[in-house]
Amino acid sequence: MDVTTSAWSETTRRISEPSTLQGTLGSLDKAEDHSSSIFSGFAALLAILLVVAVICVLWCCGKRKKRQVPYLRVTIMPLLTLPRPRQRAKNIYDLLPRRQEELGRHPSRSIRIVSTESLLSRNSDSPSSEHVPSRAGDALHMHRAHTHAMGYAVGIYDNAMRPQMCGNLAPSPHYVNVRASRGSPSTSSEDSRDYVNIPTAKEIAETLASASNPPRNLFILPGTKELAPSEEIDEGCGNASDCTSLGSPGTENSDPLSDGEGSSQTSNDYVNMAELDLGTPQGKQLQGMFQCRRDYENVPPGPSSNKQQEEEVTSSNTDHVEGRTDGPETHTPPAVQSGSFLALKDHVACQSSAHSETGPWEDAEETSSEDSHDYENVCAAEAGARG
């Protein structure tokens, strides 16, 4: 029994040994496969890391190259073809020949002397500010004298429109030429260097006396306002028997200093004239005589039909003007006639006649054509009061 048991065990052991060897070999193969797979994984990971590192290095190198200066530096090897810079002289006069000093001549300074003398002569010969107005005044005086020699009345006139009776432009013997003082520093018209024609008291009396009898050559220009006791006398043109000029105030205020624009004391172009006392009956007569409305323009001469219509209107208004100026106590409030004057653009002629109906109109037409050259000066007519 023992022999069979031992034999059985021996056979079993022999059978089991190859299986054990096979199992060992299989386990060894599996371990080798596992280790090889791990090694290959590590190798692949290392390769990826190396590739990433190389890419990063290349990117950094390219970025550094872009930051570098694009031009080449010449400091390393300078070019030999460049010319050397010339040495400039510190003083240009050192290079000039000194012939004048060798011959005993001194350098000329005539330019500096001439310039200094010119400056001194300008300062010494320049006129002071006080002499400049005197020269201008002398020139103006010569101009005024030449103008008076031509026979025209020259003066400074008020800017406001006023009724005027204009005839001959010859200067009146009764006018007094008043010239302001030259030394006054004021710039007003009272102290200016212009001549002002002021009518005397004798001429005013003749004007008031001749108001009842109208002169032979009378042409009335309209004014802007009625005559008031505070009115001023403006410059007349012509002789006292032929021409009379009466001024109306620019403003209603009688105080010359209160007016900012029309006052002659505050402006450089106007002159305060003597006041006309219209408290007398003769003054009131003039007040009614020269009351006109300002409907004045330069109207081109129309056809013959318009002239005939104007002559008819003038002849119809002549009786009113004569009736108003016959006696010194006659005072008829004038009124501006309308209706037929609309065709003439509200412009008609008002003129008193002492001889005939057509004669004065012809004289007035000649006077207006001489004054305006191309246009007829037509003023508003004065008609009697209507009931």
Curated annotation (Swiss-Prot):
InterPro entries associated with the record: LAX
Cytoplasmic side of membrane: 59-387
Record-listed Phosphotyrosine modification sites: 195, 270, 296, 375
UniProt KW Cytoplasm keyword: no
Composition bias type Polar residues, residue spans: 241-268
GO MF term (any one): protein kinase binding
Alphabetical UniProt keywords: Adaptive immunity, Cell membrane, Immunity, Membrane, Phosphoprotein, Signal-anchor, Transmembrane, Transmembrane helix
UniProt membrane topology term: Single-pass type III membrane protein
Residue stretches of biased makeup (Acidic residues): 360-369
Composition bias type Low complexity, residue spans: 118-129
Compartment annotation: Cell membrane
GO biological process, any: intracellular signal transduction
Extracellular side of membrane: 1-37
Post-translational changes noted in the entry: Phosphorylated on tyrosines upon TCR or BCR activation; which leads to the recruitment of GRB2, PIK3R1 and GRAP2.
Transmembrane stretches, start-end: 38-58
One GO term describing the cellular component: Golgi apparatus
Biased composition (Basic and acidic residues): 319-329
Keyword Protease (UniProt): no
Region Disordered: start-end pairs: 114-136, 230-268, 294-387
Pfam families: LAX (PF15681)
Self-association state and partner proteins as the record states: When phosphorylated, interacts with GRB2, PIK3R1 and GRAP2.
Function: Negatively regulates TCR (T-cell antigen receptor)-mediated signaling in T-cells and BCR (B-cell antigen receptor)-mediated signaling in B-cells.
Record-given protein name: Lymphocyte transmembrane adapter 1
Taxonomic lineage: Eukaryota, Metazoa, Chordata, Craniata, Vertebrata
